[in-house]
Amino acid sequence: MAEVLRTLAGKPKCHALRPMILFLIMLVLVLFGYGVLSPRSLMPGSLERGFCMAVREPDHLQRVSLPRMVYPQPKVLTPCRKDVLVVTPWLAPIVWEGTFNIDILNEQFRLQNTTIGLTVFAIKKYVAFLKLFLETAEKHFMVGHRVHYYVFTDQPAAVPRVTLGTGRQLSVLEVRAYKRWQDVSMRRMEMISDFCERRFLSEVDYLVCVDVDMEFRDHVGVEILTPLFGTLHPGFYGSSREAFTYERRPQSQAYIPKDEGDFYYLGGFFGGSVQEVQRLTRACHQAMMVDQANGIEAVWHDESHLNKYLLRHKPTKVLSPEYLWDQQLLGWPAVLRKLRFTAVPKNHQAVRNP
């Protein structure tokens, strides 16, 4: 290019061509820059083949015009919480009690006529936890909003009858059981991905995917809704990344080196928009199938693959351990102002084994 410009500069008769040539050079540079920096190159699908984190669009709540509301003014110089991290390095909120105004959020999502799907797997002996799960969900989960429960089970007749509130419904989705509890856990990703295509995309706006051997003890509402969220594991929220139980074997698709990692997310509470949940569950299932073909199983099964996915595709919100806690094992530390969704005491070996 420099030689071309020097040649043209040495020919006085070509002065009239200079503006046209400069224009063409600028056009080429602009088109090249667009190709490199185009937002399409930052989409999740391309990033799985590339090297940088996925960038997602915001929740679009700014499109809603709120009515007049009276509430305490947020104060720029007074942080809502001084004892915990409330935002990630990629500017995703970390949701703790005291960091949000639920009245504002309820109004925003109500005006959007949002429907939330809640998926839960009640396979084999785990069907025994379903009644308490559903009864407490009716008291605390997305109260005042439209909810669709999706119960995946191998025993449709054993699903209890629970009185549901207005705008709330339940669908029973019959699925097969697997011999090992690990396979039941891992196959959840495949089943959720399949039903995203078959039903969820046309029936709900957001999906929340949780474990069944739990109970809701306090408010769990629209403050969690976002394109993609994960939940901090109650056993690791104060730990360094070196202590996380990531999959450390390079042969696995879930492998994370010891010098990488933001947080350790648990597999029992994740979600987001249906489109994002479909991407997540499909990617995790495909990764597990590659591992299976290579004769390796990640240390914590689907949870290991979930952590790998959320490392490469940063969540747009992170839920604090308030949203899944085991009080029997961990007590109630002062940093948790509320225990919202807690483990039911049980003998793990008894419920996991036939």
Curated annotation (Swiss-Prot):
Effect of R352G: In allele A107
Coiled coil: none
Amino acids binding Mn(2+): D211, D213
Keywords: Blood group antigen, Glycoprotein, Glycosyltransferase, Golgi apparatus, Manganese, Membrane, Metal-binding, Secreted, Signal-anchor, Transferase, Transmembrane, Transmembrane helix
Subcellular location: Golgi apparatus, Golgi stack membrane; Secreted
Catalytic residues identified in the record: E303 (nucleophile)
Documented effect of changing G268R: In allele Aw08
Primary location recorded for the protein, binned into one broad class: Golgi
Outcome, altering G230R: In group B transferase; lower-level protein expression and intracellular cytoplasmic mislocation
Protein name from the UniProt record: Histo-blood group ABO system transferase
Annotated source species: Homo sapiens (Human)
Taxon lineage: Eukaryota, Metazoa, Chordata, Craniata, Vertebrata
Gene of this entry: ABO
